[in-house]
Amino acid sequence: MAGLKRRASQVWPEERGEQEHGLYSLHRMFDIVGTHLTHRDVRVLSFLFVDVIDDHERGLIRNGRDFLLALERQGRCDESNFRQVLQLLRIITRHDLLPYVTLKKRRAVCPDLVDKYLEETSIRYVTPRALSDPEPRPPQPSKTVPPHYPVVCCPTSGSQMCSKRPARGRTTLGSQRKRRKSVTPDPKEKQTCDIRLRVRAEYCQHETALQGNVFSNKQDPLERQFERFNQANTILKSRDLGSIICDIKFSELTYLDAFWRDYINGSLLEALKGVFITDSLKQAVGHEAIKLLVNVDEEDYELGRQKLLRNLMLQALP
């Protein structure tokens, strides 16, 4: 445990220079991917490479990170070649880890800005409607949204307003007013965003299906490994339970934010289990345990949040 704590707290030597460029080091990527690999995943991976990794090297593998380091020492993975790692993750159906096999740092999601904006805008719209207030106070709610707030700037709406060209011919004052009125965005016409949801059901473990069914009597170690590799790949493909990809449309920021929080805290996963893991699916897999994997694209959420924030800003315009 002390060694694990030491490795988690220390920075890899090659990572100091790459942090300035927004990149992970190869070993930091091993840490990220390896922590998500279960002990069963590591056992299956070690079983596939039993002819490549010697007994001493295999005895040092205690987790996913150690296995990836062993791949690097065998020359099967480096900063410019992740093909072997990606292929192995697909074989053990850990498609949820594929986006993490990269040296590019993932942007952190900061929902605090949304919370702050929703809180301020709710004060702005609810306060004037309060019946207990004896006299209206219009200047006070306008101060709740500071002018330097970062989401107040809306260049996209401005570009839309400037994208329409004036009509040909002479321009009168009346036509200018009509055109100005038509260019002004209608608050009722809200922008919507699509969030892609990926749901996949798979077996919890594949070790029992692989044992006794993967065999090769070829003399060459490399040919023997490839034959075992192809056999395991065929078996795992036959055990594929399928996946579903759907786009969910949102028009309200509160619903989008609630959806993202349910995804982060696992509530969405628990709710989808009752929908996708049905009795017919349980009967099809028999006594084997199955699990559900849910993935939502972080970039879709960020872009959708920006669109819906612009809707709120258009509503706030006088």
UniProtKB/Swiss-Prot annotation:
One GO term in the molecular function aspect is: DNA binding
What GO biological process, any one, is recorded here?
A: extrinsic apoptotic signaling pathway via death domain receptors
Q: Name one Pfam family in it.
A: DED
One GO term describing the cellular component: cytoplasm
Transcription regulation is among the record's keywords:
yes
Q: Which residues form the signal peptide?
A: none
Protein name as annotated? Death effector domain-containing protein
Whose protein is this, by species? Mus musculus
Taxonomic classification, please?
Answer: Eukaryota, Metazoa, Chordata, Craniata, Vertebrata
